[in-house]
């Protein structure tokens, strides 16, 4: 009886994880940035909490800034463009203030993912 209960619980857990993963994928694919916003480039880290590259970018003829206090990497977009995907780099940590990623004088390992758009 305990074995059947464990199997049933495992099946429910797998089903829940599968549904959750499907919802996440659909949300990412269906997200509409609108006509006046563009996605910021990001870098992954070993804690699986991606951070933005810089705090400001040109988008559809205008400027786009991240909110003050947002975590970021002090890395220029042109450097991000040249980074080798899946290769670890030592990246300076920063915090957005008035559209600038201000250096916190700390570093962490980061990497560009596969399939990142340029």
UniProtKB/Swiss-Prot annotation:
GO terms for cellular component: extracellular region. The keyword Glycosyltransferase does not apply. GO terms for molecular function: C-C chemokine binding. Residues 1-21 form the signal peptide. It is found in: Secreted. Disulfide bonds join 38-59, 55-96, 72-101, 91-110. Keywords: Disulfide bond, Glycoprotein, Secreted, Signal. Pfam families: EVA_Class_A (PF19429). Glycans are attached at residue 45. Transmembrane segments: none annotated. Salivary chemokine-binding protein which binds to host chemokines CCL1, CCL3, CCL4, CCL8, CCL17, CCL18 and CCL22. This is Evasin P974.
